[in-house]
């Protein structure tokens, strides 16, 4: 049985996935987990691998969902993505980026490409 919060999160991820597919991205997988990290969606944008964090906020008057991705969360996303790339070796040679999709209760979607900068 899933909690209400989990159901809301799943619905937000589904909404984000459909939105991104309409924008031309192709779905690869969802909810990839590694230790303390999870990547909500992994998609491809032509020849680029895209790791996507989905954020939902019921009330966004004070802070937009996108602004809730903390530096700690960013580090966890990067570590999880590196593990994904190691596990899927042919993919470790292609370009990657980290996007954030914010969704509000009124279904407003904000998509920020390259939201997290990674230095190699």
UniProtKB/Swiss-Prot annotation:
GO terms for molecular function: nucleic acid binding. SUPFAM superfamilies: Restriction endonuclease-like (SSF52980). Pfam families: UPF0102. It comes from the Bacteria. PANTHER family: UPF0102 PROTEIN YRAN. Belongs to the UPF0102 family. HAMAP family: UPF0102 (MF_00048). This is UPF0102 protein CBU_1742.
């Amino acid at each position: 049985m899933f909690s209400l919060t989990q159901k809301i999160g799943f619905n937000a991820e589904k909404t984000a996935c459909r939105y991104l597919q309409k924008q031309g991205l192709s779905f690869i997988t969802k909810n990839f987990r590694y230790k303390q990290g999870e990547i909500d969606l992994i998609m491809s944008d032509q020849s680029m691998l895209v790791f996507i964090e989905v954020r939902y906020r019921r009330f966004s008057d004070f802070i937009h969902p996108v602004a809730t991705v903390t530096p700690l969360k960013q580090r966890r996303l990067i570590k999880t993505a590196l593990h994904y790339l190691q596990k899927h070796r042919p993919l470790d040679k292609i370009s990657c980026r980290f996007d954030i999709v914010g969704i509000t209760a009124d279904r407003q979607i904000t998509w920020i490409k390259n939201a997290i900068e990674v230095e190699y």
